[in-house]
Every structure is written in structure tokens, then in C-alpha cells.
Amino acid sequence: MRVKITLACTETGDRNYITTKNKRTNPDRLELKKYSPRLKRHTIHRETK
């Protein structure tokens, strides 16, 4: 079952991205390196509720 999640920047707290994930294969929180427009560089974005 795929669910929609939002990804928030760990440094600014901005919620920049919306994506989907499969809860059965990835039960833990997703963590990706994505571009942060405010900082103008790539940072770690974590899944938020």
C-alpha cells in the first residue's frame, strides 16, 4: 500500500517535497538528500507526518 508523505528539511524545517512510499517495504522514516531552495544547496530531508 503506497501512502503520500512530505519531506521536511532538517536544517530549515521547510516542507519542500511530497512523494509516495510503500509502507510494507519501508516501515521506517524515509531520509533523502534533496535540494533546499532557501539554502540553495542539497540537505537531508526527512519524512514528516
UniProtKB/Swiss-Prot annotation:
GO terms for cellular component: cytoplasm; ribonucleoprotein complex; ribosome. Gene3D superfamilies: Ribosomal protein L33 (2.20.28.120). Keywords: Ribonucleoprotein, Ribosomal protein. The keyword 4Fe-4S does not apply. GO terms for molecular function: structural constituent of ribosome. This is Large ribosomal subunit protein bL33B. HAMAP family: Ribosomal_bL33. Belongs to the bacterial ribosomal protein bL33 family. One of its GO terms (biological process) is translation. It comes from Bacillus licheniformis (strain ATCC 14580 / DSM 13 / JCM 2505 / CCUG 7422 / NBRC 12200 / NCIMB 9375 / NCTC 10341 / NRRL NRS-1264 / Gibson 46).
